[in-house]
């Protein structure tokens, strides 16, 4: 209803005032390092979708901001996230991108770990010498699942309260039913600095000029219905056929997806965009090595 009102009146949701941000907020390297540490290493970030590791025994590996990760689901269905490095000499424990197995052996000296991170085998232990297996498991990173998303903190030993982090936005996230979608394809995309990249996910001002051959012809440029829950956001974008609702009684309206697109943004790095034809576009946005680079893992899901 809000989107239709904007369409009829040629308006959009607006901030109370304009905000001008200095270029240095995007390019200053000292500020970049401080923000990257506080936002991406000491706070919860989204690292995967539950549907990517759906079954007990499934695993996935990634390298995020230089940190090699091994994400597993154990036999009880619990999700785990480890630094993908052997505790002996630092070799990568698992080189496969994804698969199904319950144990992982380091290719260097064959130390073996369970998918719960426990050290369960030391090659030639009798001659190697005693190893305190209880303290030499894979380095765990705190992680939890909520609403089909895997969240983790990249600083070992640091935890978080995901319910407090998401707040009332948790219900909006759960409504997306992300665990019920299917992964069609994925890719990594290089780009500008993480804040400049993230800005592009939070407005539709660019739709007509940038997306003229894709979603642009179907959506109304610079018409936005915007709501926030703390740092998390939802954008509603009107499709051009929304004018049809002027001739339909409210109680006879079809599903909203026929007339709008909805984008949910989970701070700091996850964008969930329902797009045309029963597909969903997922973006995991991570800072690159400098203030002017970024890496985005983009997934396309099908219903």
List each language-model region with its residue ranges.
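Short Pro/Gly-enriched beta-strand edge/turn motifs at strand-loop
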Residues: 41-53, 122-127, 264-269
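Rieske [2Fe-2S] iron-sulfur-binding domain
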Residues: 52-156, 160, 164-167
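Non-catalytic accessory segments flanking enzyme active sites
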Residues: 19-64, 69
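A broad, structural surface signal
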Residues: 33, 37, 41, 84-87, ...
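Short, contiguous pre-domain boundary segments
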Residues: 3-22
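Short amphipathic alpha-helical segments with coiled-coil-like heptad repeat character
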Residues: 41-45, 94, 205-209
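C-terminal catalytic domain of Rieske-type non-heme iron oxygenases
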Residues: 73, 84, 144, 149-303
């Amino acid at each position: 209803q809000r989107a239709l009102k904007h369409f009829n009146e040629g308006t959009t949701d607006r901030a109370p005032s304009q905000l001008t941000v200095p270029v240095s907020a995007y390019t200053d390297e000292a500020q970049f390092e401080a923000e990257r540490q506080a936002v991406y290493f000491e706070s919860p970030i989204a690292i995967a979708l539950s549907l990517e590791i759906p079954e007990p025994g499934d695993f996935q590996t990634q390298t995020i901001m230089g940190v090699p990760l091994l994400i597993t689901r154990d036999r009880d269905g619990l999700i785990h996230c480890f630094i993908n490095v052997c505790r002996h000499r630092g070799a990568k424990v698992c080189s496969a991108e994804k698969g199904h197995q319950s144990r992982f052996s380091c290719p260097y000296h064959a130390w073996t770990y369970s998918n719960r991170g426990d050290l369960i085998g030391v090659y030639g232990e009798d001659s190697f010498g005693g190893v305190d297996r209880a303290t030499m498991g894979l380095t765990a990173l705190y992680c939890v699942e909520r609403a089909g998303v895997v969240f983790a903190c990249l600083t070992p030993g640091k935890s978080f309260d995901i319910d407090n982090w998401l707040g009332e936005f948790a219900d909006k996230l759960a409504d997306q039913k992300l665990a019920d979608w299917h992964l069609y394809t994925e890719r990594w995309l290089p780009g500008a600095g993480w804040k400049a990249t993230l800005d592009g996910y939070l407005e539709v001002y660019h739709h007509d000029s940038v997306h003229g051959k894709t979603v642009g012809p179907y959506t109304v440029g610079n018409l936005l219905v915007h709501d926030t829950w703390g740092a998390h956001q939802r954008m509603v974008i009107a499709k051009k056929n929304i004018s049809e609702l002027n001739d339909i009684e409210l109680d006879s309206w079809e599903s909203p997806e026929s007339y709008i697109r909805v984008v949910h943004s989970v701070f700091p790095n996850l964008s969930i965009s329902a797009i045309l034809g029963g597909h969903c576009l997922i973006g995991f946005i991570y800072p690159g090595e400098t203030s002017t680079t970024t890496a985005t893992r983009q997934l396309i899901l099908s219903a």
